[in-house]
């Protein structure tokens, strides 16, 4: 069994996901993902790496679908809920997806897919209300099986699909869990898109691997982020520089009394991370003045996950991305592929 999912059995009664003021245990996640896996399998024993696209808001259902695809032996292809139809069509065509799992909120958006492609449609709402008649036998999934395709941002052309095996995914998770000292007592707010590594691996998967809780907001809202902070339940937060800039701007517009309420909540956090783009030093310094936290910067790519990070417990240097994460080896080479001495620029190679 995939270790990420197997770990969930050790935390069955703990809260795994919180969304829209509802909480779901790991047991509920396992049961729901099993139901989705069966719906995808129909009469098959194994999806054998069939590409299964899915589009649903950040939620408990998102995780159920992702895990359901994996437990059935498929490759999960998350679609961006904000993309126009042409961008979604491109991913379906490029991956040769065999099915798309969707929530009814996106039925209208994806309806043309079923005219343009021979594609099976699976409504998550319909699956969840279906009664399960007997205890199923799901396929055994080896770790070298391909598990996910995530698309790059497409800064140098069309987005490119990056294929990860379950072993790749597991290595990324274990590296971050070790380096950033995740535990089952953690609770993180996830406001990032769930079609990129940052939201899927760094936040969601690390939380679930650890037996922790991942809380979702259905859409980005600065006020709601601070409202969650003020409940003093979350103790980790990860975002991109533009989000920290917006949070700073919003905080500055508040009354001193409202600022004080938020300031108290910052004491509950053990880690705040910035990534996916370079963090301006001015933003880092302003956030530190407001929150008391020095943002941890890290470096990674869709193709490899995270590779470099500032120290969790040690000194964090503004403008620096840090040192190799646990299990990662880094070297810098010249144009002849020779390792350079300290202080000389070159190409970063990651293992």
What are these regions (language model features)?
Residues 3-25:
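AMP-dependent adenylate-forming
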């Amino acid at each position: 069994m995939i270790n990420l999912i197997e770990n969930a059995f050790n935390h069955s009664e703990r809260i795994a996901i919180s969304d829209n003021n509802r909480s779901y245990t790991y047991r509920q996640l396992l049961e729901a993902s099993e139901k989705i896996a069966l719906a995808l399998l129909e009469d098959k024993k194994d999806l054998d790496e069939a590409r299964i696209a899915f589009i649903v808001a950040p939620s408990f259902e998102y995780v159920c679908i992702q895990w359901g695809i994996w437990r059935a032996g498929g490759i999960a292809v998350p679609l961006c809920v904000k993309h126009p139809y042409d961008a979604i069509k491109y991913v379906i065509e490029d991956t040769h997806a065999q099915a798309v799992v969707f929530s009814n909120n996106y039925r209208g958006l994806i309806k043309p897919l079923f005219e343009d492609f021979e594609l099976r449609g699976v409504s998550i709402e319909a699956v969840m209300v279906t009664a399960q008649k007997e205890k199923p036998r799901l396929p055994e999934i080896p770790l070298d099986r391909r598990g996910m395709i995530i698309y790059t941002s497409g800064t140098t052309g069309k987005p490119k699909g990056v294929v990860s095996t379950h072993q790749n995914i597991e290595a990324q998770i274990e590296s971050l869990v070790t380096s950033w000292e995740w535990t089952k007592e953690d609770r993180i707010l996830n406001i990032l898109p769930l079609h990129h590594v940052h939201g899927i691996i760094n936040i969601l998967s690390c939380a679930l691997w650890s037996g922790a809780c991942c809380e979702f907001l259905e859409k980005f809202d600065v006020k709601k982020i601070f409202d969650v902070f003020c409940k003093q339940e979350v103790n980790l937060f990860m975002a991109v520089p533009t989000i920290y800039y917006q949070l700073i701007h919003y905080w500055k517009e508040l009354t001193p009394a409202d600022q004080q309420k938020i300031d108290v909540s910052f004491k509950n956090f053990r880690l705040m991370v910035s990534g996916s783009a370079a963090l301006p030093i001015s933003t880092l310094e302003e956030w530190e003045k407001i929150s008391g936290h020095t943002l941890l910067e890290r470096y990674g790519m869709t193709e490899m996950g995270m590779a470099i990070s500032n120290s969790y417990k040690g000194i964090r240097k503004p403008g620096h991305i840090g040192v190799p994460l646990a299990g990662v080896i880094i070297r810098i080479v010249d144009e002849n592929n020779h390792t350079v001495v300290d202080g000389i620029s070159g190409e970063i190679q990651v293992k």
